[in-house]
Amino acid sequence: MEHLNQEQKAAVTCDNGVNVVYSGAGTGKTTVIAERFAYLVNEKGVNPQSILAFTFTDKAASEMRQRIIKLIPQKSLQDLHIYTFHSFANRFLQKHGKSDFAILSDSNRFFSDYEMGDQLQTVVEIYKNKVVDLELDNLEYNSAFRDACTDTFNEDFSTISNGQFRKRAATALRAYQNYLITNNLFDFSDLIIETCHLLKGNSELLQAFTESVHYILVDEFQDTNLAQYELVKLLATTHPNLFLVGDSNQMIYGWRGAVVEIFELLKNDFQAVKEFYTTQNYRSIQAVLAVANDVLTAIARKERKALVLLHSSIDSKAVPVHYKANSLKNQDQWIIYQMKQLHLNNGVPYDQMAVLFRKNKHLDAFSQTVLEDGDLPLAKLNLLTIHAAKGLEFEAVFVYGLVERAFPSLHWDGSDKHKLLEEMKLFYVAITRAKQFLFLVSVSVESFNAYYEPSRFLKLIEKEHLQTQKAAYFKEQLKTQPKPVNLYTETENAENLQKATDSKKWIILGAILLIIVIITAVLKLFVEN
């Protein structure tokens, strides 16, 4: 554990009981949870088979297994019980419940026959993530179901009312559940819900199984939905030793069913919850974190919680940039131009650049612009929604479309504080994907047929933390390309300018000498003839 900082060591070596580690962006969540596992085995003599660890993706589970096995080389992978919630529930039901079911991995086929099928499918998935018990009767009065419909339905792109949409969704949900039952199928949400039902309904099984589970570790705890949290509580019935690693500032899946008040819920359900914080960032330069910390300050103010800022010892002279485009086209062209400059002048590989979008439709439109430009290797670029980029990091990040009604998203009307807060946290997640170069791009247009204004989120950032670049209003759009942004401080720019000037002097001198040689050769030939 010599490589751990003091905050990480304090968390890893904590006593038994319920422990929460608030692990900020880039502060080593996976490292902390892997080291905790190893500490229990190597230092406390705990049997690894009595430790149960949960994460959210197969990739994350695999990475965690590989990290832990290196820390406890005397054990084998078979000794490690590290699962996604769904894979654990599937194994548990196969062994202790009805084992003749099949898993419906793709529900698209069922909903494809419905008008507005994609939206109806989303409602069903969100609702089933928000509950532990499915209530199919009186859905009109079910708050979780109504929330799922509200989160999904967008009146601006529909010919029906919100109420009509809820009725359609209720009909689709009942039909979907009947389809699953008739065909002996479970979807992923059912796996966890059924596991909870089985444990609650069989006290002997609950007692016997939880006797063997002495420690439970959960990664990305802030993304836990109600059924997953209920499962963790049930598994901790006999030995309530929980080690929960997460970041409340990265709660961006409330719309998908993650419990917004999960940390408060935990404190209500368990006594003497101990809290730890990790704030040393190993990803981003301090200039990027200064921008991130401004957003954290606003989040803390809204949530009325203690402010915990991130810090970094990574040195760089790069300065985050806010570019104010004067049109949507100008925004796209400027980003493309800057990507070329980063590659040519700063040596940043294209696969280490990312453009992050709030919506898929903006991603698709930008991809088309890149194709039309023809100079960038589209296959190497990382064009991602912010949700898809969570957990990733890149040398250079462009946050696209920081425009009111787009980011924050059009789907909220300002009345739901949780949604506005989640949008703000999404902005924070986008910023903290950047290792060295950060570009925040807004659009400002006011004309008879278009109106765009920069996102309110940009006002959260102190002016001295951003270098602002404004676009000129061209008579002919982009007749001349915008100049590349200065990414460094004035001192370094002066040094680069001097180097460039010296280089030009040598080039000019060489050209003069070459001309003299050519003239001499021509004169010699003339004289000889």
Curated annotation (Swiss-Prot):
Catalytic reaction list: Couples ATP hydrolysis with the unwinding of duplex DNA by translocating in the 3'-5' direction; ATP + H2O = ADP + phosphate + H(+)
Amino acids binding ATP: S23, G24, A25, G26, T27, G28, K29, T30
Keyword set, alphabetical order: ATP-binding, DNA-binding, Helicase, Hydrolase, Isomerase, Nucleotide-binding
EC assignment: 5.6.2.4
Protein family (similarity comment): Belongs to the helicase family. UvrD subfamily.
Annotated ranges, domain UvrD-like helicase ATP-binding: 2-285
Record-linked Gene3D superfamilies: 1.10.10.160, P-loop containing nucleotide triphosphate hydrolases (3.40.50.300)
Identification of the protein by name: Probable DNA helicase MPN_340
One CC-aspect GO term: DNA helicase complex
GO biological process: recombinational repair
Protein's UniProt keywords contain Nucleotide-binding: yes
Molecular function as annotated in GO: 3'-5' DNA helicase activity; ATP binding; ATP hydrolysis activity; DNA binding
